[in-house]
Design a protein with these regions (language model features):
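Glycine-rich phosphate/adenosyl-contacting loop at the front of the ribokinase-like
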Residues: 1-69
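Active-site/binding-pocket entry motifs
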Residues: 5-12, 91, 104, 130
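Beta-strand->loop->alpha-helix junctions that form or flank phosphate-binding loops
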Residues: 50-51, 71-79
Length: 163
């Protein structure tokens, strides 16, 4: 559960200031975990919200093409899909710029996931990035409490970036 965003990855090395060509990719650390779990043969369901825009369409289609259950990805007509621009500097470090103000994945609500059920064999994976708003934190708490009651394993990725 959590952030699902477009990563615009630079085609060459250099800072974002120096880069002028990007390739659109599906991104978000928890989404990457979900896809890899599916490739390992696990059932995979993603819980989030994206904008009712072309970027959201691309992300849902990408996860669906990987076999991920997208039935719990909500769509918002009022909020955009999150975007990130990333390049690789000459020293190998990544250079990020995020566009996540008033984006759909930061405004998930418990009501979006009332029908989600967990069981003992499940894993609920989430990261710190999606905890940036009170609404998202409350929703994560709601889902974590449901998962813990069901005996689900909770996995936290402290993938915090300050930019």
């Amino acid at each position: 559960m959590g952030e699902l965003l477009i990563d615009f990855q630079s085609e060459g090395n250099g800072s974002l200031k120096e880069t002028d060509r990007f390739v659109k990719k599906a991104g978000g650390a928890p989404a990457n975990v979900c896809v890899q779990a599916k490739k390992l043969g696990c059932d995979a369901v993603y819980l989030t919200k994206v904008g009712a825009d072309g970027f959201g369409d691309f992300l849902v289609a990408t996860l669906e093409s990987e076999g991920v259950d997208v039935s719990h990805i909500g769509r918002s007509a009022d909020l955009n899909t999150s975007l990130a621009f990333v390049s690789i500097r000459e020293n190998g470090e990544r250079d990020f710029s995020f566009y996540r103000t008033m984006t759909a994945d930061l405004y998930i609500e418990p009501a979006d996931f009332e029908d989600v059920e967990f069981s003992k064999g499940d894993v609920l994976e989430f990261g710190s990035v999606a905890l940036a708003t009170d609404t998202a934190r409350d929703t994560h708490r709601y889902l974590i409490e449901k998962a813990v009651k069901a005996g689900t394993l909770i996995c936290f990725d402290p993938n915090l970036r300050f930019n």
